[in-house]
Amino acid sequence: EMQRSLVGSEMCIRDRMYEMIEVVNAILPEDRPRYLMGVGTPVNILEGIERGVDMFDCVMPTRNGRNGQLFTAEGVINIRNKKWEDDFSPIDPEGTAFVDTLYTKAYLHHLVTCGEMLAAQIASLHNIAFYLRLVTMAREHIAAGDFRPWKETMVQKLTQRL
C-alpha cells in the first residue's frame, strides 16, 4: 500500500519518510529535541517516536474529527456509517476525554448526519485526547523497555476500520 504523507512541502512515500527521519536524526545533535511537522496519523506518530522524534504537530485529529472520523486504540471509526446509528455504547469506553463516556456512538452519528456543529467539537475533543493518551502510553512503554512490541501491536490495531 502506497500511503503518501506530507513532510514540509515534499510529498514522500511513507517508507521514504521514515528513512529520511533516520538520516536527519543521525545528523542532529543528540541533546536537542526532534520535531516532525505536519505528520500525524497515529501510526506515523508511533513510527516517528521509534525513530527518535520528540515532537509532532498536525491538524489530523481535528480535521478528521470534523469529518466524522474517530481514532481509538482498537481502530478507526467513521461515525457517519449507518452501522453506528443504533450503537448506544460510549464513543470510547477507554477514552480519557469527558466526551468519550458522556456521549454514545448513536448520538454522535445523529449529530454528524444532521450537520450539527457539536459533532465536530465532540469528535475533535475525543481525537485530541486520544492522541495525548497514545503518546502517554508510548512514553510508558519506552520507560518499561517494551516499546517496540507494544508499538507493533498498536500499529495493527490502529489501522483497523471499525
Task: Mark where each language-model region is.
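Single conserved hydrophobic/aromatic residue that forms the stacking wall/gate
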Residues: E1-G8, C12-I13
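Alpha/beta catalytic cores of nucleotide-metabolism and tRNA/nucleoside-modifying enzymes
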Residues: D15-L36, P42-L162
